């Protein structure tokens, strides 16, 4: 695995070539609480933000908290996911759950901003959003990724059900009686299995 914990990183994309004798790299950086911005990366130095077009707009918007979680899924493997909490979250309250299932299946939820399947939108409406990266997701290792081959509804389904049960059992603020599952493409396929 490139990262020891697939929920601990921010997403970078590097559509640009390195500059100045291969010592500076331009990249776009995204996270759950920030849309894309252009940064430079230079060795051990802190990144420098070059372009942040959304900075002013985001100052007036409260964005939900997010946290990673992990559980033991199919084949005894660790499976990773995210919980996005509603605005004005109160741990003493019970919240409905929106389980978002990513497409692909060879894709993954990362700490990234999305303009189409943005979990922040559901959290803004009062849902606890659960994002699980079942077998077949990218970012862990090739065996984890390839486990979905010829078995789209097998171990990934097991991971999703085990994961949502884990969340329901370990997070007191989750309303077990008010849950829905959503997804597009492969995510829609998995919703039909559920």
Label for each model-derived stretch:
Residues 8-10:
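Amphipathic hydrophobic-ligand
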């Amino acid at each position: 695995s490139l990262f020891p914990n697939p929920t601990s990183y921010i997403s970078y994309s590097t559509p640009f070539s390195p500059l100045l004798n291969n010592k500076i790299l331009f990249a776009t950086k995204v996270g759950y609480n920030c849309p894309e911005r252009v940064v430079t990366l230079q060795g051990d130095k802190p990144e420098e933000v070059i372009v942040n077009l959304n900075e002013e707009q985001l100052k007036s918007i409260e964005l939900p908290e997010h946290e990673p979680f992990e559980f033991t899924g199919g084949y005894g493997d660790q499976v990773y996911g995210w919980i996005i909490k509603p605005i004005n979250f109160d741990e003493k309250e019970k919240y409905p759950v929106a389980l978002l299932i990513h497409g692909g299946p060879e894709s993954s939820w990362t700490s990234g901003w999305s303009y189409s399947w943005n979990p922040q939108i559901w959290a803004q409406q009062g849902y606890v959003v659960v994002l699980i990266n079942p077998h077949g997701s990218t970012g862990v290792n090739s065996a984890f990724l390839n486990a979905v081959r010829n078995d789209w509804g097998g171990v990934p389904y097991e991971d999703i059900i085990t994961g949502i049960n884990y969340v329901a059992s370990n997070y007191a603020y989750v309303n077990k009686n008010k849950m829905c599952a959503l997804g597009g493409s492969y995510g829609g396929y998995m919703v039909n299995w559920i």
